[in-house]
Amino acid sequence: MPKPGILKSKSMFCVIYRSSKRDQTYLYVEKKDDFSRVPEELMKGFGQPQLAMILPLDGRKKLVNADIEKVKQALTEQGYYLQLPPPPEDLLKQHLSVMGQKTDDINK
């Protein structure tokens, strides 16, 4: 029990929504169904938010696909964090790189 006059620090949570328009795109906000700090244009492009999860950030060291410190900072400063999908793999570039290495090995 906290001592009188000492306030217990507020836990930090975020609410994560999946985009209905863009695959692998997520919007993190501070409170459930509160998009008041999210720019209108972003919301139009995001589509109807679909609740994915509510996540406590305190005591957590990392998130799967986002830098937790950037998420916390964005939530505090602007009230939201937008997680975009990772860039697509360039399979042709990877293949050509491997083929180039094999050619170099053959020429040695």
Curated annotation (Swiss-Prot):
It comes from the Bacteria. Residues 12-96 form the YcgL domain. InterPro entries: YcgL-like_sf, YcgL_dom. Transmembrane segments: none annotated. Pfam families: YcgL. This is Protein YcgL.
